[in-house]
Each structure stands twice: as structure tokens, then as C-alpha cells.
Amino acid sequence: MANASPLVLIVDNSRAVTGALNAMRHATGPLRPGIAFEYVLPSGSTGRSVLEADGYVVHELPFVEISRRKVDLLRYVPMLLLNGWRLRQLAQNRNASLIHLNDFYNLTGYVARFFSMGQLRVLTHVRFLPQTLPQVFARPWRWLAEHAAQQVLCVSEAVRGYFAPGHAGVCTVYDPLPARGEQQPPYVVSGAPNQLVRLLYLSNYIRGKGQNFALEAFKVAYACNPNLRLHFVGGDMGMVKNQEFRRELEADAQAAGLEEVVQFEGFAANTEVAMKAYDIVLNFSEAESFSLTCLDALYYGVPLIATDCGGPAELFEAGHSGLLVPNRDVPAMVEAMVSLAGNMALRQQFSTASRLFVREKFAPAHTYQLLADCYRQVLARA
């Protein structure tokens, strides 16, 4: 049966709830029912329940990603072809008009388009910072995006800079603000002499996400201000390497004698509740194409310290609505943590200014409405 609205299949590699998956949820939600969406996730992804709770139909395919494991390398091409055929069949059975790849390393949509004899349209979202990826992979992915996709969406100007200047099929579409708005009371900056200052690091435990830098900086900052407390909150996505990374961080904190002031917790389903319980949000990632975590902190008005690692620099005005520190610069992180923790007036300024800034820059016309325009343009070319 034909759909009353055009159907877009969102293909996402997330095996758990990630920033990329949440960003798409925030973007597609306001576009229903004018455009219908169904998601395609890896088999066994824990993101399925979240999407189904939002009312989406979810399909699964056994995606295989390129990795250092020999078994994955051997399986990659055969499974890419098989999943491409399955995706083409799924699109045909569901009468889908468009496949939206939620990152450009997922090549399944291109294979599905090939098997459809060019009938399927493909839109590719670039959510990694390609400049930081192994170029032996990134360059072919870029070529495919520029030549095989009908539209390429970059989540920031930092990402857009990797693609050919002036390419008509490449544009920047920022991720939207939380679709449900604020559900909790407005954030209030608090502080008094000798009061604890709580620092939140909200990120999955993945190497490169910067928790190690935060812990190193906190060791020095805590010696300067014993009222500081640091909480790491995030999931491991069920991956052994992420579990090992968390254990390394916990062992490091214990070896430094900080187990009473540094805490480690699991995945937080409600970002707003988590963030509003703290005084400062930290994000010291080594590379971010955008950073939904930073955007959420700014939206809720929780003072932010972030590294200059790509996309975050576009999310706020450094020094006016947040602090931006050089990438991998632990002394600068220490200085920012100590100075902001001890300056309630500056935290209040950041809280007020950040809320205003993101609501203007990431208004619907610059985010999900622009995405809808891209869908319509691609569909109109059929």
C-alpha cells in the first residue's frame, strides 16, 4: 500500500543510543506526519526501544563495520553487498522514496541504489569530522558522497570544509535543539562560599571523547579548589574496548586518591535532568563534528567548558556564552575549571547568554526545516 506521505528510511549504525541517533530523532520528530520516517538499525541495537517509544517503525540489518578484527574485514564486503540488497528490498516493500544515511561511512545506501538501477535516492549525513579519520578511508567515502548521493548534509562548517568548495550537492544543516523543549524547571546558577561545585562529564566511554584529559586536569584543579567534584556519566555501548577504557579511568582516579570526589556512572536516559543537577558541563573531546552534548548544555543554560576540536566552536561565543580551551591542553583545562568554578557571576552570564544564542542560531529554519527542504528538493528531482 502506498504511503500518504513520502517515506524516508533512516539508516543508522548506532548499536546503542548515541548523539547521532538522538540528533536524528530531534530532527525527524517535528517533520511528521508530513514526511513519514522508519529507522534501520544494526541487529540488537538498544536504540530500538527508544525509537519505538517515539512511535517509529524500526527494522534491523546485520551491519558490519570496518575494524582491525580480521573476521570483520573478511565479512565486510560480502555483508555490505548482502545488506545493500536487503535494504533495496526493504525500500521496495515499504514503498520508501529516499534512503537517508546517518553517517557517510555507512555505504549500504549506495549499494541499495545500485541494485535499484538508480531508482532509489540517497541522502548522506556527515557526522564525523572527516579530517581526523584515516584518509585511506575518508577520501573514498567523500568521493562516494559527492558523486553517488543526491544530497550531502554536513552538521557544521568544520565538516563542510572537507568537501569541494561550491559543490551544489553539499550543504550545512545544523542539528536541532531538543524537540521536546525543557520539561524541568529552568536551570538556576547557584553558589556560595565553600559550596561544592559539581562538574559533569556526559559522554559514552569511548577513547577520544576526552574523559582522560578531564581526569588529568581535575587532579590539578582539585588541589587548587577542594570543593570541586567530578562525575562521569555515560554508557559503554556493550563494547569491550569501551568497558576497558572506563576501568582504566576508574583505576587512575583511585590511584590518585580521588575515589571520594570522582564518580563514574552509567548511561543517563534523561539528559536534561542529568545536566541541571550540576554546576558546569565539560566536553574535552579530541574531535567533534558538532556535539549534541554541548548544544544541550547551552540550551539548558548549564555553563560549559569545551575544547576547540571542530564543531563545538560554532555552538557558542567563546568568552561570552561559554569557555573554549585549546584541544588536548590540560593546563588550559585546569585554568578554565578553576576560574569558572570560582566565578559565579561569569557562570550566570554564560547561563543567560548561551540560552539566547542557541535559540537564535539553531532555530527551526536553520535545522529541521532546512532538512525538510533538502528532502523535498531530492524528491522533486525524481
Residue ranges and their predicted role:
Residues 50, 231-259, 346:
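Short, structured helix-loop element that forms part of the nucleotide-activated donor/catalytic region
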Residues 8-9, 191-209, 215-218, 230-233:
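Conserved donor-binding/catalytic core segment of Leloir-type glycosyltransferases
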Residues 317-319, 323-330, 339-344:
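Conserved acidic donor-binding segment of nucleotide-sugar-dependent glycosyltransferases
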Residues 83, 101-107, 126:
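Short His-centered aromatic/hydrophobic patch
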Residues 10-18, 30-74, 159-162, 238, ...:
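N-terminal strand-loop element at the rim of the active site
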Residues 267, 286:
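Aromatic "clamp/platform" in nucleotide-sugar-dependent glycosyltransferases that forms part
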Residues 18-26, 197, 206-223, 244, ...:
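A conserved mid-protein helix/loop that constitutes part of the nucleotide-sugar donor-binding site
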